[in-house]
Amino acid sequence: MSFVVIIPARFSSTRLPGKPLVDINGKPMIVHVLERARESGAERIIVATDHEDVARAVEAAGGEVCMTRADHQSGTERLAEVVEKCGFTDDTVIVNVQGDEPMIPAVIIRQVAENLAQRQVGMATLAVPIHSAEEAFNPNAVKVVLDAEGYALYFSRATIPWDRDRFAKSLETVGDTCLRHLGIYGYRAGFIRRYVSWQPSPLEHIEMLEQLRVLWYGEKIHVAVAKAVPGTGVDTADDLERVRAEMR
């Protein structure tokens, strides 16, 4: 099947300045992400960035770059600019791969594209089971609950679903119903155009989760269990050191 990968790579980061260009074992992080995307079989891979240094690093590795504005409020808005500049048709399948995921398995990039292509839905994503209480109660681990057909009912930083009987006895174990959302999305290009035409929703501001805008406006998001679990993403200097060790 045919799909396009877009990798947003914003240069500024409060916790890790210049994050796309941090060195991981001799290569900029964004180049590692580009290489994982190439392994997915995508027809085209575009790095969307607001910084010339990132563009130069990607082009030196043989990658394609689309320069974008620096004032986007979300990654989806940056994708929308790329969709318009490249003139993608509404039915083009786009996979958004985060630029700080150098250990993302290529198999799940393709998985989310295939899941979207097989359904009449504008957006698809992935999740993995949560097995530890620490992760279940961590607000940085976004949880998702699904309906009987595998569509998202809600995403939250809170612990959902709340296992009333289990948690009344102990907060140290979790059952088998808790899922952690992975920050990888598949969209049809036309859906991205619609998304950015909607006003932000109150829920996305409360939770700071932009995918809640989709549910707020009554649209569906398909969620499948990922075929592989991604390695550590890079948000902080500690994450960076951990990834360097894991990729050595």
UniProtKB/Swiss-Prot annotation:
Gene3D superfamilies given in the database record: Spore Coat Polysaccharide Biosynthesis Protein SpsA, Chain A (3.90.550.10)
Q: What is its main location?
A: cytoplasm
Which CDD domains has this protein been placed in?
CMP-KDO-Synthetase (cd02517)
Where is it localised?
Cytoplasm
GO aspect biological process, one term: CMP-keto-3-deoxy-D-manno-octulosonic acid biosynthetic process
Main EC class the enzyme belongs to:
transferase
Q: Which UniProt keywords are listed? A: Cytoplasm, Lipopolysaccharide biosynthesis, Nucleotidyltransferase, Transferase
EC assignment: the record states 2.7.7.38
List the NCBIfam families. Answer: kdsB, PRK05450.1-3, PRK05450.1-5, PRK13368.1
State what protein this is by name.
3-deoxy-manno-octulosonate cytidylyltransferase
- Please give the organism: Salmonella typhi
Starting at the broadest rank, the lineage of the source organism is:
Bacteria, Pseudomonadati, Pseudomonadota, Gammaproteobacteria, Enterobacterales
